[in-house]
C-alpha cells in the first residue's frame, strides 16, 4: 500500500493509506488505532473501533527487566568514555538513544504496576507525566540539559539515581531480583 500525510490549509492532518483489497484484512488486524472514514463499497464487515490496547504498557518478564538494567548500566560506561575523551556528541548519542530509553522504559513499568498495565503512555512516552509524581517528572526533565560536559555529567548522575530508585521499586513490586 501507499501512505500519504495530507495537511490542509486549516492545519488538520490526515494519514491516508491506500492499499490493494487483498491486504485489507491484514491491515485491519495490524493496527488497532485506525479509523475508517469511508468504505463506499461496504467491504468491511465488522465495525472498526479504534483502541490503544496494543500499545498498553506490558508487564516485563524477569529477563526483560534484567536486560533493561544491564543495557542501562553497561551503556553508561560509553557515555562516561565519551565525556572523558571530550567526544560530546558520542556521549550525547549514547545517553539519549540508549540510557534515556532504558530509564523511560523502567519508569513506564512503574506506571504499569501502579495502573494494572491497563494504559498506554503514548509514543515516545509523551503522556508519562500524567502518571508519575511531580518530583520524578522534574528530575526526569533535569536530565535533558546536554549543552555542556558539566551538564551531561550532572544529568548522567541524576539518571543513575532515578534508575536505581525506580528499578529497585519495580523489582520489589514484581518480585524480581535486582542486579547488584
Where are these regions (language model features)?
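Conserved nucleotidyltransferase catalytic core and NTase-mimicking acidic/glycine-rich helix/loop elements
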Residues: 56-180
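Conserved NTP/Mg2+-binding pocket subregion across the NTase superfamily
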Residues: 1-90, 94-96
Amino acid at each position: 500500500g501507499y501512505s500519504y500525510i495530507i495537511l490542509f490549509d486549516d492545519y488538520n492532518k490526515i494519514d491516508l493509506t491506500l492499499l490493494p483489497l487483498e491486504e485489507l484484512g491484514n491491515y485491519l488486524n495490524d493496527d488497532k488505532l485506525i479509523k475508517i472514514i469511508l468504505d463506499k463499497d461496504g467491504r468491511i464487515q465488522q465495525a472498526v473501533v479504534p483502541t490503544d490496547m496494543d500499545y498498553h504498557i506490558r508487564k516485563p518478564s524477569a529477563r526483560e527487566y534484567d536486560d533493561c538494567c544491564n543495557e542501562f548500566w553497561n551503556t553508561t560506561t560509553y557515555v562516561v568514555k565519551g565525556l572523558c575523551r571530550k567526544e560530546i556528541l558520542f556521549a550525547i548519542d549514547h545517553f539519549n538513544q540508549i540510557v534515556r530509553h532504558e530509564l523511560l522504559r523502567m519508569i513506564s513499568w512503574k506506571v504499569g504496576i501502579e495502573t494494572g498495565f491497563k494504559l498506554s503512555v503514548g509514543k515516545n512516552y509523551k503522556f508519562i507525566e500524567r502518571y508519575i509524581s511531580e518530583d520524578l517528572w522534574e528530575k526526569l526533565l533535569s536530565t535533558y540539559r546536554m549543552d555542556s560536559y558539566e551538564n551531561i555529567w550532572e544529568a548522567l548522575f541524576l539518571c543513575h539515581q532515578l534508575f536505581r530508585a525506580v528499578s529497585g521499586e519495580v523489582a520489589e513490586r514484581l518480585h524480581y531480583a535486582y542486579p547488584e
